[in-house]
From Swiss-Prot:
It is found in: Cytoplasm. Participates in chromosomal partition during cell division. May act via the formation of a condensin-like complex containing Smc and ScpA that pull DNA away from mid-cell into both cell halves. One of its GO terms (biological process) is DNA replication. One of its GO terms (cellular component) is cytoplasm. InterPro entries: ScpB_csome_segregation, WH-like_DNA-bd_sf, WH_DNA-bd_sf. This is Segregation and condensation protein B. The keyword Cell membrane does not apply. Belongs to the ScpB family. Gene3D superfamilies: Winged helix-like DNA-binding domain superfamily/Winged helix DNA-binding domain. The lineage of its organism: Bacteria, Bacillati, Bacillota, Bacilli, Bacillales. Homodimer. Homodimerization may be required to stabilize the binding of ScpA to the Smc head domains. Component of a cohesin-like complex composed of ScpA, ScpB and the Smc homodimer, in which ScpA and ScpB bind to the head domain of Smc. The presence of the three proteins is required for the association of the complex with DNA. It comes from the Bacteria.
């Protein structure tokens, strides 16, 4: 196996080891090479990352090597973190989120009555994005799950409290709440 292939494999090992990183001994064992050789390759790769226009660097802490982003790009990473996750939500998920935000705590059945369609997939998406969570159980047959918004919901849409949601007039309450909330979210995230 040539040096380029070894570096390619080590790059993959660094990636899959994630934040935990990887010891040179582990690399040596996987590649069936001496530990000193693994260290030499890692040091070469560190220099290559430093000299090139690359977004990643290889760092060593307590004998463990791992990938890390470069400090000079930190402002760009922060912009990504600050980008609302709503951009990745479907229209159905946004509509369901609007209903939960204005009517919480609310059951899945109540959401489906308002939307007129099933909400299983949308609920699953919203829970996985940590925008809603189970708030308890409703009284009544089957004790259905009650859903409500989370702190992450407030953070994502730049709200301090639910009171910061645009108010719904009586006339607007008869309209599709999801469309109103979707419009409000677009205003908030600008």
């Amino acid at each position: 196996m040539d040096r380029k292939e070894q570096k390619s494999i080590i790059e993959g090992l660094l990636f899959v080891s994630g934040d935990e990183g990887i010891y040179p001994e582990q690399i040596a064992k996987v590649l069936e090479i001496e530990m000193n050789e693994a260290i030499n390759i890692l040091e070469e790769m560190q220099q290559e990352c430093e000299g090139a226009n690359r977004g990643l660097q290889i760092v060593q802490y307590a004998k463990v090597y791992r990938f890390a982003t470069k400090k000079e790009h930190a402002s760009y990473y922060q912009k990504l973190i600050d980008t609302p996750t709503a951009a990745s939500l479907s229209q159905a998920a946004l509509e369901t989120l609007a209903i939960v935000a204005y009517r919480q705590p609310i059951t899945r059945t109540e959401m489906e009555e308002i939307r007129g369609v099933k909400t299983d997939k949308a609920l699953q998406t919203l829970v996985s994005h940590l925008l809603i969570k189970e708030m308890g159980r409703a009284e009544g047959p089957g004790r259905p799950i009650l859903y409500g918004t989370t702190k992450e919901f407030l953070d994502t849409f730049g709200l301090k409290t639910l009171d910061d949601l645009p108010p719904l007039s009586e006339e607007n309450e008869q309209m599709n709440e999801a469309d109103l909330f979707f419009g409000s979210l677009q205003e908030i995230s600008k």
